[in-house]
Regions:
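RNase H-like two-metal-ion nuclease catalytic core shared by retroviral integrases
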Residues: 36-38, 124-126, 132-135, 149-168, ...
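An active-site-proximal beta-strand-loop segment
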Residues: 49, 53-89, 95
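Active-site beta-loop-alpha junctions of metal-dependent nucleic acid enzymes
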Residues: 73, 92-115
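C-terminal domain-tail junction helix/linker
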Residues: 140-144, 166-224
Length: 224
């Protein structure tokens, strides 16, 4: 509006968006608390914020995020992305955030990709699920090299933060998921689709209710 010569305060715009247009901001639910576990083994940061990969399946990043059903129940998603092209190679959701969820996600990714023994580095934070005996031993058994962010440094795993923000802003925060099956299907299948298919096409096909009455508007290529 400024380019058209109009000047309004943020308060005025907010008032008319609410009263005249019926538009409301989407507020993210409060992040659920988790209990820290005792680490079995902590690894150094081998990536050091170098998120460039020369080829697929060279550097992967992984993390957990929380998602909500309409009734307020929380579910946890574990995802892995390939830094070569930022594609999602695995996404698994469950009721509990555990080392088993992390293992199942990595196992799913490895089964879907052709990985040369000892060629893959998996970067994560220092959450107990990734430092647990079960997970570290699983990584060793499949010849995956672990790398970890320094505690408290979210920028060390920035690609995962960016992916989860996009997932929530363009998908899960816009729709009311009545059942966990609806949530699991969208969160686990949508990221695996070709990039030419937008979220709106897939969500509309499932006839999911839109939150707050608002509408939401493959070849692997390297990301520079």
């Amino acid at each position: 509006m400024g380019r058209e010569g109009y000047s309004y305060s943020a308060t005025t715009i907010h008032k008319y968006m609410n009263t005249e247009m019926g538009l409301h901001s989407i507020v993210r639910p409060k992040k659920p608390g988790t209990k820290p576990g005792k680490p079995h083994k902590i690894f150094g940061n081998k990536l050091r914020q170098d998120f460039h990969a020369d080829k697929p399946n060279q550097k992967w990043c992984t993390d957990f995020t929380y998602l909500f059903l309409k009734n307020g129940e929380v579910r946890y998603n574990c995802a892995i992305i390939d830094l070569y092209d930022r594609s999602v190679v695995a996404s698994v959701t469950d009721r509990y955030i555990t080392s088993d969820l992390a293992i199942r996600t990595l196992q799913k990714a490895l089964e879907a990709q052709r990985i040369s023994k000892g060629s893959l580095t998996l970067h994560s934070d220092q959450e107990s699920q990734y430092t647990s005996k079960a997970f570290t031993e699983f990584c060793e058994s499949v010849y995956v090299t672990q790398s970890m962010s320094k505690a408290g440094y979210t920028y060390d795993n920035a690609p995962m933060e960016r992916y989860f923000n996009t997932l929530k802003n363009e998908c899960t925060n816009l729709y009311d998921f009545q059942t966990e099956q609806e949530l699991y299907r969208i969160v686990e299948e949508l990221p695996m689709l070709p990039t030419t298919m937008c979220a709106r096409t897939v969500i509309t096909a499932t006839a999911l209710p839109i939150r707050h009455g608002q509408e939401h508007e493959g070849r692997r290529e390297q990301v520079s």
